[in-house]
Amino acid sequence: MKLSKYIDHTLLKPQATEKDILKLIEEAKTYDFASVCVNPSWVKLAYENLKDTDVKVCTVVGFPLGATSTASKVYETKVAIEDGADEIDMVISVGQLKSGNDEYVKEEIKKIVEASKNKLVKVIIETCLLTEEEKVKACTLSKEAGADYVKTSTGFSTGGAKPEDIKLMRETVGKDMGVKASGGIHTKEEMEAMIENGATRIGASCGVQLVR
């Protein structure tokens, strides 16, 4: 697979304007990225500009804290799908996971998978806030709940993707689930290190410089 198809070309800054989003979309078309990842309010715009291409529209749910209610996340998911999203990157309830409330975490993911109507669901586990044991648990629960990917980070917390986390996540979920590295990937060497350790998707705001 060519490098560009690993990349979710991402712009999630709250101050991003319509002009910024349109630039992101044009870059995704030019470089043939896997998707653009935008906030929910921009999904319709992305869909309208990408519907005749093979670039997917990805958006975020429960972002960036993961601390909204399950009902809110489900509603966000349904609206995003109606607006044209192909992929949902949801944030787990980190606090519920760290409290040992495994069933809450698993059921929430399951409900979002159901609401996504067979669109791709990626579960952001926010590795920088978790112990090794919690990372394994988050990945296991995500797989059991039927998600398509586990993802390292929002890019809005205390740290981003690390090769060793990707390796652990890949070992935990096995070969038949996607692993997405995101947060702090700025060079081709960093991206290749993630892929070598098992990443099948890369979230990056600097996708163009990664493939040039």
From Swiss-Prot:
Database matches in InterPro entries: Aldolase_TIM, DeoC, DeoC/FbaB/LacD_aldolase, DeoC_typeI
Protein location: Cytoplasm
Catalytic residues (positions): D89, K151, K180
Record's catalysed reaction(s): 2-deoxy-D-ribose 5-phosphate = D-glyceraldehyde 3-phosphate + acetaldehyde
Keyword check for Transport: no
Pathway: Carbohydrate degradation; 2-deoxy-D-ribose 1-phosphate degradation; D-glyceraldehyde 3-phosphate and acetaldehyde from 2-deoxy-alpha-D-ribose 1-phosphate: step 2/2
Assigned EC number: 4.1.2.4
Keyword Plastid: no
Principal place of residence: cytoplasm
Family: Belongs to the DeoC/FbaB aldolase family. DeoC type 1 subfamily.
PANTHER family from the UniProt entry: DEOXYRIBOSE-PHOSPHATE ALDOLASE
Known function: Catalyzes a reversible aldol reaction between acetaldehyde and D-glyceraldehyde 3-phosphate to generate 2-deoxy-D-ribose 5-phosphate.
The name this protein goes by in its record: Deoxyribose-phosphate aldolase
